[in-house]
Curated annotation (Swiss-Prot):
Protein's name according to its UniProt entry: Zinc metalloproteinase-disintegrin-like VAP2B
Positions annotated with a glycan in the UniProt record: 371
InterPro entries: ADAM_Cys-rich, Disintegrin_CS, Disintegrin_dom, Disintegrin_dom_sf, MetalloPept_cat_dom_sf, Peptidase_M12B, Peptidase_M12B_N, Reprolysin_adamalysin
Top enzyme class: hydrolase
Lineage: Eukaryota, Metazoa, Chordata, Craniata, Vertebrata
Binding site for Ca(2+) 1: 201, 285, 388, 391
Length: 609
């Protein structure tokens, strides 16, 4: 067990406040100059590591003293993290750099419950922190033989282009009732209890235009990508999702696809390349392309509800800002679409801040998802079961040695509740990361007051008729693995058949798309799926839309009968160019007695699984 090292750094505010200066983030109109002075409180004879696992900074912001607590983001890189670039003659060069002693941190401001921080300590302090509701940026001043830093509000960075920046995903909701319903729900501790952590293994690709923009400096590009993902990781922690960087590929000699200003074309090409090339070389869950090409009218585009799909678990992002925080928020936004999150409506809220999933980029980038985003994300996860993000990082996946006090449970630790000053776990000895005498457990869904829960105590609620509840064994603090009823078992009074823990029926799918008073349409509506046109088809093969055979028409586009007030649409359907798959009948849906949908065919349930 390695003892946590607490380091204090005093930053004295320089008496001069600048009026204007050009920094990495752009032209800044109002800033403070501070000088970091590192004061180390190490035991006599102790060897100071290059980058401590826990640090504390004292500094003045607007003349007021604040304390910034930082902890190393030990889950930033995966164990098998790799980097790929290309020689001038096109030869692939892949390396596996040692990244365990990295310099990327998350943190908070003391006595500010709503504060956040994402900081790189590689060469001075660079990043952002939120203090009393305002976003501040910090970075070293590039002065010879000087440790001067600039601290400034994000709002004081001059914006070169004041035009509104939009996400390219469009919504054709004919009813906003589902979003309104979600906005009225409250995130409860009980609801969170049944949401197991998810783990997204992210792969980044940087195009040739970005290489040119950075004058071929690959190290500069890599550092920027690390800082961006560190912030994305911070953002998703509050969604109970951990984002780890598993790979970075830089198209240093030439683009591997044709990158065009037309975002839809580029996203489609990138998805095809990921499916046929990248996935054959590197296992990952989600890929994002960063480009310096000026995308027409948008700054990002992604498929909706596509996480884990070989082609569609992708997004593209325009690197339109020099501020890493801004690009990180765009990346979190596009990945949010992959996780089933739509743009926020007027019903959605994230407190007093602008929310990440608003269609346009906020004048001040937010690091908060709305209540609607939370429920849409977890509705997608629980109902569509994207299996690739189920593998939670185990202790053996943490690439650096175990460190007591970093709030990560690692090999050799019985518990880890943070530093002794911050630990709030009555079962855990924060100094040793061992359970206190008499304690059986310190965490887990089957741990109550430091003891194993009684046998039979429900620890994971039933999410559907096909997903029975799990109960504690009385011998462990962990809830047993989530077990579903066998696929094909009848459910909902024979209206459907179980599929991956759900009972998919068309009525529920119509409700999810259009809200209340909408039902499965008459059979005649589904005959439109025999056309093989842009919306009516059963499946796609090599990019071509295949019309449904007569016996398969209920396994193509979903049609619903809208009986809501003021509506009279007997064959209502949903179609979007950005996400053609949305609005199709879901796999496993009953299409006839004894038959279910499988890959666009209506097949016998006995042979489907």
């Amino acid at each position: 067990m390695i003892q946590v090292l607490l380091v204090t750094i005093c930053l004295a505010a320089f008496p001069y406040q600048g009026s204007s200066i050009i920094l990495e983030s752009g032209n800044v109109n109002d800033y403070e100059v501070i000088y970091p002075r590192k004061v180390t409180a190490l035991p006599k004879g102790a060897v100071q590591p290059k980058y401590e696992d826990a640090m504390q900074y004292e500094l003045k912001v607007n003349g007021e003293p604040v304390v910034l607590h930082l902890g190393k983001n030990k889950g930033l890189f995966s164990k098998d993290y790799s980097e790929t670039h290309y020689s001038p003659d096109g030869r692939e060069i892949t390396t596996y750099p040692l990244v365990e002693d990295h310099c990327y941190y998350h943190g908070r401001i003391e006595n500010d419950a709503d504060s956040t921080a994402s900081i790189s300590a590689c060469n001075g302090l660079k990043g952002h922190f939120k203090l009393q509701g305002e976003m501040y940026l910090i970075e070293p001043l590039k002065l010879p033989d000087s440790e001067a830093h600039a601290v400034y509000k994000y709002e004081n960075v001059e914006k070169e282009d004041e035009a509104l920046k939009m996400c390219g995903v469009t919504q054709n909701w004919e009813s906003y009732e589902p979003i309104k319903k979600a906005s009225q729900l409250v995130v409860t501790a009980e609801h969170q209890k049944y949401n197991p952590f998810r783990f997204v293994e992210l792969f980044l690709v940087v195009d040739k235009a970005m290489v040119t923009k950075n004058n071929g400096d690959l190290d500069k590009i890599k550092t920027r990508m690390y800082e961006i993902v560190n912030t994305v990781n911070e953002i998703y922690r509050y969604m109970y999702i951990h984002v780890a960087l598993v790979g970075l590929e830089i198209w240093s000699n030439e683009d591997k696809i044709t990158v065009k200003p037309e975002a839809g074309y580029t996203l489609n090409a990138f998805g095809e390349w990921r499916k046929t090339d990248l996935l054959t070389r590197k296992k990952h869950d989600n890929a994002q392309l960063l480009t310096a090409i000026d995308l027409d009218r948008v700054i990002g585009l992604a498929y909706v509800g596509s996480m884990c799909h070989p082609k569609r678990s992708t997004g593209i992002i325009q690197d339109y800002s020099e501020i890493n925080l801004v690009v990180a928020v765009i990346m979190a936004h596009e990945m949010g679409h992959n996780l089933g999150i739509n743009h926020d409506s007027g019903y959605c809220s994230c407190g007093d801040y602008a929310c990440i999933m608003r269609p346009e980029i906020s004048p001040e980038p937010s690091t908060f998802f709305s209540n609607c985003s939370y429920f849409e994300c977890w509705d997608f996860i629980m109902n569509h079961n994207p299996e690739c993000i189920l593998n939670e990082p185990l202790g053996t996946d943490i690439i650096s040695p175990p460190v007591c006090g970093n709030e990560l449970l690692e090999v050799g630790e019985e518990c880890d509740c943070g530093t002794p000053e911050n630990c709030q776990n009555e079962c855990c000895d924060a100094a040793t990361c061992k359970l206190k005498s008499g304690s059986q457990c310190g965490h887990g869904d089957c741990c109550e007051q430091c003891k194993f829960s009684k046998s039979g105590t429900e620890c994971r609620a039933s999410m559907s008729e096909c997903d029975p509840a799990e109960h504690c064994t009385g011998q462990s603090s962990e809830c047993p693995a989530d077990v579903f009823h066998k696929n094909g078992q009848p459910c909902l009074d024979n209206y459907g058949y179980c599929y991956n823990g759900n009972c998919p029926i068309m009525y529920h799918q119509c409700y999810d798309l259009f809200g209340a008073d909408v039902y499965e349409a008459e059979d005649s509506c589904f005959e439109r799926n025999q056309k093989g046109n842009y919306y009516g088809y059963c499946r796609k093969e090599n990019g071509n839309k295949i019309p449904c055979a007569p016996e398969d028409v209920k396994c193509g586009r979903l049609y619903c009968k809208d009986n809501s007030p003021g509506q009279n649409n007997p064959c209502k359907m949903f179609y979007s160019n950005e996400d053609e798959h949305k609005g199709m009948v879901l796999p496993g849906t009953k299409c006839a007695d004894g038959k279910v949908c499988s890959n666009g065919h209506c097949v016998d349930v006995a042979t489907a699984y």
